Each structure stands twice: as structure tokens, then as C-alpha cells.
């Protein structure tokens, strides 16, 4: 499954926390999904920053709800010294970053998702992850093809994905079919 190439054999488990379930987000409408995730992330980071500022100003703890776009992610409590208690955070990591991609929601952007997918499913490595700057070689997988996917290639692929229209419902014109 996606990202399994990053796990060693010693990680084999039957725990549901590390399952091979499928629930991967579709690519149609993915640009909108990524924008929403970024907006929600920014909202929560701003809420946390405001709580930290208020706690510093008042000299006492400030508890705030993490509510964005009608979705609650629990709460954080900021202390006057800048520490933030995240024990009440739910449904998102304590860094408050929404990661909408991959089957477990562990990938932050379509670009990261696509770099992983191109490597895992097509055996093609993006220069920005597997190229000379990061690995010291232009042919990380030693298949005799150097610089397989440039930054421009990856940008074009991600822009294509991001611009795919969201799915829509088409109601048949035949009333019998429409009623079915």
C-alpha cells in the first residue's frame, strides 16, 4: 500500500492502527480539497497563535476551541509562558496541519502524494526527492535513467490533478431512469 515502501519488515503488525485499508481520496476535485485543507490549517494555527498572545497578555491560561469551517478539532490551552497543551486536540495531529492525502491522511500535499505515487507505482523518481541535491546521485534507483522527473514535470502533473473538476451527479432525462 502507499508509503509501505518506507517501512521495514520489522514493522509487520495486525494492529488496526497500521492497517492496509483503502479510503484514498479521489483526484477529481482534489485542488479544492487541498485548498480547504490549507484554509483549515491556517485557521487553526491562527486560533492557537491568538490564544498564545492572549495568555501572554493576561498572564494566565487561555483555552480555545479549534473550530474551523464548522468542524471541531477539540481545543488547545495556551499558557502565559507560550507552552500549549494539546491534550484535547482530536482528529488532527498536534501540529494542527490537515493532511488530506493517502489512505490514512498522512500526506500534506498533492505534490508529496504524487512524488510518492510516481515512485511507488511507476518506479519513477522525482529529482526534488531523489536527485543529486538530496541523495548525491542523479540515478537513485540505479536503473540507468537519470533525473527521471524534473521539478517542472512534477509541477505539470500536480497542476493537471489540481484542475480536475469535482465529480457531479447527472440525472437521466428518462423519468423512469431518474426515478430508479
Outline where the language-model segments fall.
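Periplasmic c-type cytochrome electron-transfer domains
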Residues: 1-180
Amino acid at each position: 500500500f502507499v508509503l509501505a515502501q518506507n517501512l521495514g519488515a520489522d514493522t509487520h503488525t495486525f494492529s488496526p492502527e497500521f492497517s492496509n485499508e483503502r479510503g484514498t481520496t479521489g483526484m477529481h476535485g482534489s485542488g479544492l480539497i487541498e485548498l480547504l485543507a490549507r484554509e483549515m490549517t491556517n485557521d487553526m494555527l491562527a486560533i492557537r497563535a491568538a490564544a498564545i498572545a492572549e495568555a501572554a497578555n493576561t498572564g494566565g491560561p487561555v483555552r480555545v476551541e479549534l473550530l474551523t469551517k464548522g468542524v471541531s478539532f477539540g481545543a488547545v490551552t495556551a499558557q502565559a509562558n507560550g507552552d500549549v497543551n494539546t491534550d484535547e486536540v482530536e482528529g488532527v495531529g498536534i501540529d494542527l496541519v490537515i493532511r488530506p492525502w493517502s489512505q490514512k491522511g498522512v500526506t500534506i500535499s498533492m505534490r508529496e502524494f504524487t512524488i510518492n505515487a510516481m515512485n511507488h507505482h511507476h518506479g519513477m523518481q522525482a529529482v526534488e526527492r531523489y536527485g543529486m541535491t538530496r541523495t548525491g546521485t542523479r540515478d537513485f534507483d540505479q536503473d540507468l535513467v537519470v533525473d527521471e522527473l524534473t521539478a517542472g514535470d512534477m509541477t505539470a502533473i500536480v497542476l493537471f490533478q489540481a484542475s480536475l473538476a469535482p465529480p457531479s451527479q447527472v440525472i437521466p432525462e428518462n423519468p423512469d431512469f431518474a426515478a430508479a
